[in-house]
Amino acid sequence: MKQSKVFIPTMRDVPSEAEAQSHRLLLKSGLIKQSTSGIYSYLPLATRVLNNITAIVRQEMERIDSVEILMPALQQAELWEESGRWGAYGPELMRLQDRHGRQFALGPTHEELVTSIVRNELKSYKQLPMTLFQIQSKFRDEKRPRFGLLRGREFIMKDAYSFHADEASLDQTYQDMYQAYSRIFERVGINARPVVADSGAIGGSHTHEFMALSAIGEDTIVYSKESDYAANIEKAEVVYEPNHKHSTVQPLEKIETPNVKTAQELADFLGRPVDEIVKTMIFKVDGEYIMVLVRGHHEINDIKLKSYFGTDNIELATQDEIVNLVGANPGSLGPVIDKEIKIYADNFVQDLNNLVVGANEDGYHLINVNVGRDFNVDEYGDFRFILEGEKLSDGSGVAHFAEGIEVGQVFKLGTKYSESMNATFLDNQGKAQPLIMGCYGIGISRTLSAIVEQNHDDNGIVWPKSVTPFDLHLISINPKKDDQRELADALYAEFNTKFDVLYDDRQERAGVKFNDADLIGLPLRIVVGKRASEGIVEVKERLTGDSEEVHIDDLMTVITNKYDNLK
């Protein structure tokens, strides 16, 4: 394709709010253009990359007998009300109303809709298992879109849904999909690591995320260097081994602590290590207030709280709620309280006595507080995030951290949707049973960004061969010169029969063409310049920067060999 005919609006400067390298490079190289916050148009080069990604995805889905369909993005509220997610999903769900007053959502996922499609069709165990997938735009009303395609309000996804008669069948499809995802990410050129994760708003009993390692990743991966253990930090279990630091029990004292609001400020004020301070936070669980205690250097993990209490309806109490409940602001909270409120403490609080806690009075704290004498703990548990260097639950060693971008996730849904939506089949005994489900998502547009995030240098994108928008970049330095133009035209005609060629025939300065070529990042470059009359051209590899002069008689062999050896 001739570059003069392709819409590639490269930029010299990018908006300052473009923080991620992938966002900056996708804008700068003319692959995407922002419409409004969190919403982008995919321009010709990006569309070609997306087509290459989806072709790989389709191949791997068909390899495991997953069948493609296409469902509407617009979903009626009644389906979401059946599953209970219309009220539970939260403000991220894009809701709208038609002229007749009917409520709809622009789908972030399609569990409800696909369940409604199959519930009157898959009626016998003989029809199972069945796996359906689609590739489609999704919508989520992100509060703060950022990082370009990595956290947008409209995005492209591959979502698949499987239906089973028993858990063994679900396990097999889950494993097949897990392996397919591993192959997909390897093929598109992403270093992605599967990690144990939380199922979030989709629900289900078991899930893995596929995380593309990246410094700008919004998720922290906990992993072992001695085993294949890997988990999202939200799910990483903290191993408790008692390490009591008990001293002689001291009398309870109330001390003045002016302008002290955080655990670190309190530790500095008292001249004590922060891990000897105990923080108190108040949450609402299904509308009931509870207190949760952790040591000063630890952070409460609300995902673990949701798992512990078996509900998603957990939120941190607001400042007004806290003041109304205990008469003090959040920085002064403590468990010594004359109100009926259940108290839960992280396991590691047990290692301390003579605790330092808030006095439930602004400007004051209590020291030498002891469990059993001054207050009681209803239950201990693992309520916090793991720290780097702590022991891992598989016994393999200690926790190491890395940042990652979630590009895919696989879920075992069980009967969450089939039971609430009455999707049943007859088993081999003729008894009605709820369909057992799995769901499996890949962020296609996220994958595009993740590829760029992991495959770039200071000059621009470096596309992996499998997804590159074109194989070769043919550049005529000066098309006004007959010998250069004629040779470039001839090479374009020859190489276009075997490769996808982007032919830069523009009337631009050589420096502009070379800068754009580096920015766009096609794997191989053929430059027709001042030695065209001798039949000599330059061949350059984008990844290594290696270049050599080649006679046109040898050019097809050289290019073919180089292309075959590309990653």
Swiss-Prot record:
GO molecular function, one term: proline-tRNA ligase activity
Catalytic activity from the UniProt record: tRNA(Pro) + L-proline + ATP = L-prolyl-tRNA(Pro) + AMP + diphosphate
Name of the top EC class for this enzyme: ligase
GO cellular component terms listed in the entry, alphabetical order: cytosol
GO terms classed as biological process: prolyl-tRNA aminoacylation
Keyword flag Transmembrane helix: no
InterPro entries: aa-tRNA-synt_IIb, aa-tRNA-synth_II, aa-tRNA-synth_II/BPL/LPL, Anticodon-bd, Anticodon-bd_dom_sf, Pro-tRNA-ligase_IIa, Pro-tRNA-synth_IIa_bac-type, Pro-tRNA-Synthase_IIa_type1
Subcellular location: Cytoplasm
A matching Pfam family: tRNA_edit
Subunit structure: Homodimer.
Function as written in the Swiss-Prot or TrEMBL entry: Catalyzes the attachment of proline to tRNA(Pro) in a two-step reaction: proline is first activated by ATP to form Pro-AMP and then transferred to the acceptor end of tRNA(Pro). As ProRS can inadvertently accommodate and process non-cognate amino acids such as alanine and cysteine, to avoid such errors it has two additional distinct editing activities against alanine. One activity is designated as 'pretransfer' editing and involves the tRNA(Pro)-independent hydrolysis of activated Ala-AMP.
Family: Belongs to the class-II aminoacyl-tRNA synthetase family. ProS type 1 subfamily.
Protein name: Proline--tRNA ligase
Protein species of origin: Staphylococcus aureus (strain JH9)
Gene: proS
